[in-house]
Amino acid sequence: MSVKIRLTRMGSKKKPFYRINVADSRAPRDGKFIETVGTYNPLLTENQVTLKEERVLEWLSNGAQPSDTVRNLLSKAGVMKKFHESKLSK
């Protein structure tokens, strides 16, 4: 089972916000997921991202692949740097 960390669209028409979910790569975008690890609201001026960092790091260390957009969000939050540092220290 290939696992991805990706965005799930929520909200109403023209007012989206996204949940950052861990899901099987074969599941549809807004379909079944394993765990919610954060949220992302692009409508706020600072593009608010909330994350459960320890859970994201755990999923990344277990082999979950982030989508391109999620990878950018994690990089801006500093999570990818922590992941690479922990990977190099092993």
Curated annotation (Swiss-Prot):
Signal peptide: none annotated. GO terms for cellular component: cytoplasm; small ribosomal subunit. Transmembrane segments: none annotated. Keywords: Ribonucleoprotein, Ribosomal protein. Pfam families: Ribosomal_S16 (PF00886). InterPro entries: Ribosomal_bS16, Ribosomal_bS16_dom_sf. One of its GO terms (biological process) is translation. GO terms for molecular function: structural constituent of ribosome. SUPFAM superfamilies: Ribosomal protein S16. PANTHER family: 30S RIBOSOMAL PROTEIN S16, SMALL RIBOSOMAL SUBUNIT PROTEIN BS16M. Belongs to the bacterial ribosomal protein bS16 family. NCBIfam families: S16. This is Small ribosomal subunit protein bS16. The lineage of its organism: Bacteria, Bacillati, Bacillota, Bacilli, Lactobacillales. The gene is rpsP.
